[in-house]
Amino acid sequence: HNGAAALSDVTRRGGVAYTYSPWMRDYESGYSLHSLGSFYKINQRNAILLGLRYFGYPEMDGTGEGASGIHPKEIAVEAGYAYEVIKNFSVSATFKYLFSDMGRIGNSRGASSVAFDLGVLYKCEINDWEGAGWSVGLHVSNLGPKINYLTSKDALPATVKVGGAADLPFLQMHKLTLTADLGYRLS
């Protein structure tokens, strides 16, 4: 449930993060996910974010098997805005440009689309327990038109997720966070 709406809770003015994840290592090497994200808090109630994700596939030949110089990839560029409507209640919207290049397999060429994500987050402190709190959020992702390949149009994996979290401090510098999420794929 932690979409861009969670930025209203951040106390820093801005931040940048990079992650790398080798994907399906036990299945086949060559899959990787690179993510670069940043945010900037304009003021106490407004924040903007930028992100870039790159998913690389292993090198393939023209049939999708083995190596022969074809490098499929997926790229997403994101820009978003988060706003704290009232104390403890935030909303967010993220615009994404999506590009998919299956490496010129057959007669295909790269395909692109756009999508939107929407989120809401409510958080609350637990009375009589310093630093403790809970939150609940809703996130709807990949709302947008189908992605257009040369010979087909495929629906984006639109999803809706709801989740909650509880932060429970147990020592001065430590806390336990319990979370639960439920998701449903719309398309």
PLM features: residue spans?
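Subset of outer-membrane beta-barrel
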Residues: H1-S187
